[in-house]
Amino acid sequence: MIQVLLVTICLAAFPYQGSSIILESGNVNDYEVVYARKVTALPKGAVQPKYEDTMQYELKVNGEPVVLHLEKNKQLFSKDYSETHYSPDGREITTYPPVEDHCYYHGRIENDADSTASISACNGLKGHFKLQGETYFIEPLKLPNSEAHAVFKYENVEKEDEVPKMCGVTQTNWESDEPIKKASQLVVTAEQQRYNHYKYIELVILADYRMVTKNNGDLGKIRTKIYEIVNILNEIFRYLYIRIALVGIEIWSNADLSNVTLSADDTLASFGTWRGTVLLKRKSHDNAQLLTAIDFDGQTIGIANIASMCNQNKSVGVVMDYSPINLVVAVIMAHEMGHNLGINHDTGSCSCGGYSCIMAPEISDQPSKLFSNCSKQAYQRYINYYKPQCILNEPLRTDIVSPPVCGNELLEMGEECDCGSPRNCRDPCCDAATCKLHSWVECESGECCDQCRFKGAGTECRAARSECDIAESCTGQSADCPTDDFKRNGQPCLHNYGYCYNGNCPIMYHQCYALFGSNATVAEDGCFEFNENGDKYFYCRKQSGVNIPCAQEDVKCGRLFCHTKKHPCDYKYSEDPDYGMVDNGTKCADGKVCSNGHCVDVATAY
């Protein structure tokens, strides 16, 4: 018999108004105090693991009771996970620590379908959860003989008043610089577009010597930070059907093994070369990210090679340890890995339902865990075009568990599924006794799969995102939603204020809204004449690194000008050459759209 015991958090809901406290996450000026008491729920007589597979907590947030459900992230580590550091005389020291009974969880809030959670339960509860659309952080208070925790919002963490930080990627596209009609002519098969089937990235994270000195030589603190970051990465990338397996970390505890300089570009190039010539020879993996404590020149906090996943010297990124809040660093790393997966920076016409999206070139006031519609489309195109083999297939498990053991919840050679023991199996498609799919199973996952069977023909599987898009429906013969299609490019939309372009209706008003907020409108025509200057800020396009001035008829296809409370000719500029420019496909005159810095007839543009 299973003895079910509640896990309770008793809350004293009294925010310390006007006071502040120094936590690992920084100086917090408004928080609530939570007292946690945990009791396990196990079969009678069972050996209690240090950290249970599932846990439940009851707590109050803003005086309202909530129930937090947590489930251990069993796919966080690969079974051949290793850790490497270096002795003072430079000797490589590699260990293979046991990681099965780890303390990193994902979760949700009961009765809140949009909720998420990423929590470390190693020493109290540390992490974040999303409740009713708002993100809260929880962290243990360092009080003697106390189980007190602080609950607070990101906005209550004091931040330095500094210029906005940016991604250092300036390459605008991994595809050829062809006319914009190329995107509308993409043709992919149903098999090629199976981007919604899970991919697996085997990740190695390296910490440079500055990370060691920043943390006073405490390698355990660096390891914990990396674990929490990767746990968050898994939460983020599941929306792209990607799982991140940490196969190793390496800490340059004695000296940097590649050049880490103030130049982010040089650091990336050196790290990529070292990864391809040294690291890959001793540790199999798909992607490597360098976590550094250096403060790069300019506004850069991260950089990566675009469309480079699986490439020997280029499947890398460099991320600055910009914040003590691990969610912020994880979002930066997710951004750079997004570039590795062929995703470019978001423009004004991209949206994710939040204030900002992961691939925004400038770090947001509120860290976002959401990829935009543009990011999802770019990732799908990349998968279809490049077919990066190292992530298309689930990693072989021969190096993880051998021989295969049915019932251990690991999919191994010879198994079609593995949902655990017959008592614990929750997968209706899987026969837990044999680790084979039931004979009647038609599918396991996909937008057109429900309870192991294909959804009926005509069932909508992808809603139209705009009047320029087309809703897709299941065929009844496949688990996959048909290829994302959209209305003909150049068709008028939004009451003739714009023309359809790849399923969207890009107009300047929406782009101003995205850049400056709801009070912004499109500036007067005279503002756009600045684009004839061809200087650092105002131009139509770049050619061989040179800013090309706009011809008079093209001025509305260069820098975007918006009327704001601050200025009638307001604009945005950053190191990213696309940021703040008028989006391709935007109406620039009656019957004309922007195409690579030119205002051309809509009939010839597509």
Swiss-Prot record:
SMART domains: ACR (SM00608), DISIN (SM00050). Ca(2+) 1 binds at residues 202, 286, 390, 393. Binds 1 zinc ion per subunit. Transmembrane segments: none annotated. Residues 199-395 form the Peptidase M12B domain. Disulfide bonds join 310-390, 350-374, 352-357, 406-435, 417-430, 419-425, 429-452, 443-449, 448-474, 461-481, 468-500, 493-505, 512-562, 527-569, 540-550, 557-594, 588-599. InterPro entries: ADAM_Cys-rich, Disintegrin_CS, Disintegrin_dom, Disintegrin_dom_sf, MetalloPept_cat_dom_sf, Peptidase_M12B, Peptidase_M12B_N, Reprolysin_adamalysin. Its cofactor is Zn(2+). The metalloproteinase-disintegrin-like HF3 is a potent hemorrhagic toxin that activates macrophages for phagocytosis through integrin alpha-M/beta-2 (ITGAM/ITGB2). It inhibits collagen-induced platelet aggregation. This protein shows cleavage specificity for substrate for leucine at P1' position, followed by hydrophobic residues in P2'. This is Zinc metalloproteinase-disintegrin-like HF3. It comes from Bothrops jararaca.
